[in-house]
UniProtKB/Swiss-Prot annotation:
It catalyses: uridine(55) in tRNA = pseudouridine(55) in tRNA. GO terms for molecular function: RNA binding; tRNA pseudouridine(55) synthase activity. This is tRNA pseudouridine synthase B. The lineage of its organism: Bacteria, Bacillati, Mycoplasmatota, Mollicutes, Mycoplasmataceae. The keyword Transmembrane helix does not apply. The active site is at residue 40. One of its GO terms (biological process) is mRNA pseudouridine synthesis.
Length: 292
């Protein structure tokens, strides 16, 4: 019988998230493997790998906020907004002061706005990914999405090499490549992402992430610990049979709209949602089914 849980992986550069997940599957001979959000090919950092029954809670972990460190090269623009693309525009460098940069950066603190994703992205329009339109040189309407930038901090400004190094905390769905373009526009210039490292996904930190070459079953985080780490409400329920059968249950003095139900051994059994008053109904069950 195989265990269920998550691995906190540190994705290296130049492999896709899909390739990384496949490596996990083959290395540990796991039947069901998923993830909580892709990273660009050139990006590095935290990827949450879901194993077996943990794949059933992907939506809850996927909605988590993220944090990144990003290096932006000024005065050059690529079609993909990163180093993987082709250069489509250059600009004669001009002086941008540290004060100017700090003034622009300060705008992106607790800032919500309509962001346009890059054409080279996996967002689907009419059943087709945006990058497929780009590769086929086809026109497509790109719709904006509301995102929130909670905090942006300037880590370094390399004036000699025209590079800005930032720390960004943002909501799910934020494209850092698009954010880089927007920051450059505010500086009256162009730019692209040369380095991108995801340092946080929910409460999973880069310092806890494992390189694929070092990965083993000992690095598995249980579903129980994963949901606790991310501040979800966990309730131990006395009648396990009712939960396994997907029946409505009564939970008193619970303010949360969503709760994870566990047994006395800290096995997460199901996700329940508030139905009315103190009655909860099952939203996702079968989280403790055996995988062979």
């Amino acid at each position: 019988m195989q265990k269920s849980g998550i691995f906190i992986l540190n994705k290296p550069k130049n492999i896709s998230t899909y390739q990384l997940i496949n490596q996990v599957k083959k290395k540990l001979n796991i039947k069901k493997v998923g993830h909580c959000g892709t990273l660009d090919l050139l990006a590095t950092g935290v990827v949450i790998c879901l194993v077996n029954n943990a794949t059933k809670i992907s939506d809850y972990l996927l909605n988590a906020n993220k944090a990144y460190q990003v290096k932006i090269k000024l005065f050059t623009l690529t079609d993909s907004y990163d180093g993987e693309g082709n250069i489509i525009q250059t600009q004669i460098p001009f002086d941008i002061s540290l004060d100017q940069i700090n003034k622009v950066i300060s705008k992106y603190n607790n800032y919500s706005y309509e962001q346009y994703p890059p054409i080279y992205s996996s967002i689907k329009v009419n059943g087709k990914k945006l990058y497929q339109y780009a590769l086929a040189n086809q026109d497509v309407e790109i719709k904006s999405r509301k995102v929130t930038i909670f905090k942006t901090k300037l880590l370094n400004y390399d004036q000699k090499n025209y590079e800005i190094f930032l720390d960004v905390k943002c909501s799910k769905g934020t494209y850092i490549r698009s954010l880089a373009i927007d920051i450059c526009k505010d500086l009256n210039t162009i730019g692209y992402v040369v380095e991108l490292n995801r340092t946080l996904s929910g409460n999973f930190d880069i310092n806890s992430a494992i390189d694929i070459k070092d990965l083993s079953w000992k690095h598995l985080t249980s579903i129980y610990d994963a949901v606790k780490i991310n501040d979800f409400k966990v309730v131990k329920y006395h009648n396990i049979l009712d939960v396994k059968q997907g029946k409505k249950i009564v939970l008193n003095n619970i303010k949360d709209q969503l709760v994870f139900i566990s047994d006395e051994q800290n096995n997460i059994l199901a996700v329940y949602q508030k139905y009315e008053n103190n009655i909860f109904k099952v939203k996702r069950g079968g989280l403790n089914n055996d995988i062979y």
